[in-house]
Amino acid sequence: MPVITLPDGSKREFAHPVSTLDVAADIGPGLAKACIAGRVNGELKDACDLIETDAELSIITAKDEEGIEILRHSCAHLLGHAIKQLWPQTKMAIGPVIDNGFYYDIDLEHKLTQEDIEALEKRMLELAKTNYDVVKRVVSWQEARDTFAARGEEYKIAILDENISKDATPALYHHEEYTDMCRGPHVPNMRFCHHFKLMSIAGAYWRGNSENKMLQRIYGTAWADKKALSTHLARLEEAAKRDHRKIGKQLDLYHMQEEAPGMVFWHNDGWSIFLELERFIRRKLNQYTYQEVKGPLMMDRVLWERSGHWDKYSEAMFTTSSENREYAVKPMNCPGHVQIFNQGLKSYRDLPLRMAEFGCCHRNEPSGSLHGLMRVRGFTQDDAHIFCTEDQVQAEVSSCIQMVYDTYSTFGFENIVVKLSTRPEKRIGDDAMWDRAEEALKQALRAKNIEFTILPGEGAFYGPKIEFTLHDCLDRAWQCGTVQLDYALPSRLGATYVAEDNSRQTPVMIHRAILGSLERFLGILIEEYAGRFPTWLAPMQVVVMNITDKQADYVEEVVKFFKEQGIRASFDLRNEKIGFKIREHTLRRVPYLLVVGDQEMENKEVAVRTRDGVDLGKMRIEDFAAKIHQQISLRSLKLLEE
């Protein structure tokens, strides 16, 4: 007689084993209709799975995040169902859930076209609208293998042979005549899977190994209702308009080419923004009392072996050799910073020592993963390492957190998700050390009233970590900032200081990044602002235009004055209509468009309008410069208003 405890603490007693669906029906028909799955004693289960003993139960619906993931997973099976109807010879590989959707890798000789995808989506909807039940069967390993062998599903057989123990009991999910294998759970009925769209096709190697066969990967998205799907598709459409690769080309910010994959060719305007970002962070470093250093681009392999990077990271490192010595181009700055710390005797009085670098790093990312500025091989890291005593950890972490929030708010990012990764199973140090380290990070976050979630076991083997993920205007998540404690690297590389009792001690090292990669952060900003940078970041802040040749000399004087004031300004003296000039510079997203006619020239004024089309009227050039200076010094995100 199982007793089921619900989230509100209420209990329901049953005379026989029950499923989550039975419990939902016992509560009410509405909940039974909405029930997708259950969380039984913390574990997700299919709605049909029987509960035979006392248990805590949460009923999962499409309102829950887990419910959305489950229906997406079931849409992947629905995709398989439709594929096998349209192309019966298809061999199915894997079909997992991903952010906002799902995909399925398939082996099909016929190369799918956009017309095929549309036909596939249509068939999926036809199948889903029959609202058929999804039937789960738990079978022996051998029966599962025999089932897929009879269907010629070689990839499913490979999964069984290579990944699933022979004494396991795999679950088979039957979608009418189509059968798939999965850990589950899945929706009990296809009425939950009416709101989806197939998005794109790509190539993908089986098992992610380039030595294996290239499969076709079909991506899709799925949501609980029509409104959520429409909202997501509208967001994707807006994201496409904001694509930093497209805007970067339109605004002539940078380019990339095949001869240097994953490496950025910065053009004048893009480099101007990059340098402004760097100047901004440099001012923060001064405010928070950091030393700025510069380490070598590459170092002998021996040093990377001592640091431990060679064992764990060598495949991602670029190497070269000279005079019988092997060198590695640095993928990160930390070992170099320890070398700088080790120069000269350090005392406890020297700590904390905060060392920062705009380090030019390189990582040999797979070519297929490269994506504009967001995923590159050569990048600049706004990296810092703080050497401190264990007693100083909490205060230093607190300072890092403040710096992160100060920085992100300047760019308009207020929605920051914070996660704390704690001790993994394999780790250095004793439990007491980890207790102190994790507690120091927790206290630093709590002291600033920052909500955070704990990721148990997700920390590095050498220390716990805080991750800062910002959400942009399209609610996309970008993990940028990190604060990582390291109890291993200083010891491996021989870093010590003289303690107050004259003993030699190893400092704690705090790895700190705020923007992460400057290239990636600039890509994020391009998309966040859609290329409409705030005045302080804009590569060209002001453009001054004449109406006739008569005003040309005055326009040049105005621009010279602005440049002397430190304002990035240019002129447009072309023999074009003023409306044409305004449109062109509006498309270039220049914040302020200044027009000069006879009257403005006579009164030593300019007619000011913004790229948004707001007419600010006439101003004396000194007054306009003062207003712009104030905007720049405050790093305002808004333009001047009427």
UniProtKB/Swiss-Prot annotation:
Q: Which reaction does it catalyse?
A: tRNA(Thr) + L-threonine + ATP = L-threonyl-tRNA(Thr) + AMP + diphosphate + H(+)
Keyword annotations of the record: Aminoacyl-tRNA synthetase, ATP-binding, Cytoplasm, Ligase, Metal-binding, Nucleotide-binding, Protein biosynthesis, RNA-binding, tRNA-binding, Zinc
Per the record, which residues fall in region Catalytic?
243-534
The domain of life is Bacteria
The cofactor note reads: Binds 1 zinc ion per subunit.
Give one GO term, molecular function aspect: threonine-tRNA ligase activity
Q: Which PROSITE patterns match?
A: AA_TRNA_LIGASE_II, TGS
**One BP annotation, GO:** threonyl-tRNA aminoacylation
**Could you say which residues bind Zn(2+) here?**
334, 385, 511
Which InterPro entries does this UniProt record tie to the protein? Answer: aa-tRNA-synt_IIb, aa-tRNA-synth_II, aa-tRNA-synth_II/BPL/LPL, Anticodon-bd, Anticodon-bd_dom_sf, Beta-grasp_dom_sf, TGS, TGS-like
The cofactor(s) it depends on are: Zn(2+)
TGS domain mapped to chain residues: 1-61
Q: What is its EC number?
A: 6.1.1.3
The entry's family comment says: Belongs to the class-II aminoacyl-tRNA synthetase family.
- Record HAMAP family: Thr_tRNA_synth
The UniProt subunit note reads as follows: Homodimer.
In Swiss-Prot or TrEMBL terms, this protein is called Threonine--tRNA ligase
Species per Swiss-Prot/TrEMBL record: Shewanella sp. (strain MR-7)
